[in-house]
Amino acid sequence: MAIDLTALWDFNKPDVSEQRFREALATASGDDALILQTQIARTFGLRKDFANAQKILQSLDAAVVTAGAEARARHALEWGRTFSSATHPAETQTAQNKQQARDAYERALTIARGGKLDGLAIDAIHMLAFVDTAPADQLKWAQQALAVVEASSQPAAKMWEASIRNNIGHALHQLGRFDEALEQFERAVVLRERGQNPRATRIAHWMVAWTLRAMGRTDEALAIQLRLEREWDAEDAPDPYVYEELEALYGSKGDEARANHYAQLRRSADEGAAT
């Protein structure tokens, strides 16, 4: 792929990303054009318009058959994401839809492995955790993805490490294995702090504090969440998840006044996000 897809993506603004991909598509050809269209389809999926995403991908079916490994793997990945992903409501996750997603992700994984596209192989493995949602299964898939990260020398694979360690930590947390979860989250923080994504770095710190609270290390968790509150507020982007944790932390300390204060802030932030 001659075009840097990462530079075109803003996952928080799929409409903006779509426009960027369409502008790039105007001068693209061959596999690059196919790949850009798979990403346009993904922008619709992020907006929960799965029907339009599928329509775009189906229009590529014939051309993808003779395309290279990257285009075929991305096409399969995005087809799977129209059936099972982080944006799908729970009621859509029928056995049939999950099987459609599994088939597509496994096909993407096979293609990516055959094409030595480690980053796409990791993407496919990590998407299988949206099909198999039991914490033990999610841990299994995340550990398999991490094995690919650690064995690969490809930048596209290495860039996944923080996300995959976060996923491992989340599964371990759900399993009540808090010490192990904390280790993974702290390693993810180190990786995030090397990058240039303040939002992802704050989320990584939030995961650490969330786990510290579960371990009874309330004061440490509180210090982190209060710092995160200040950082988000400085950007005029209040985070309801930080407020939720502060509500729980002050509640556990018996400070009902502060707990109620953060409960109100959380409700206000949630209402603001919904409008």
Regions found by a protein language model. Give the residues of each.
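TPR/TPR-like alpha-solenoid signature
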Residues: 2, 38, 75-77, 123-126, ...
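Primarily a tetratricopeptide repeat
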Residues: 19, 55, 96-99, 103, ...
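Residue signature of alpha-solenoid helical repeat architecture, marking inter-repeat boundaries
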Residues: 31, 70, 119, 156-159, ...
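Short coil/turn connectors between adjacent alpha-helices in alpha-solenoid helical repeat scaffolds
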Residues: 5-13, 42-52, 83-101, 129-141, ...
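Residue register of alpha-helical TPR repeats
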Residues: 35, 74, 123, 159-163, ...
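Amphipathic alpha-helical segments of tetratricopeptide repeats
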Residues: 25-26, 58-65, 106-113, 117, ...
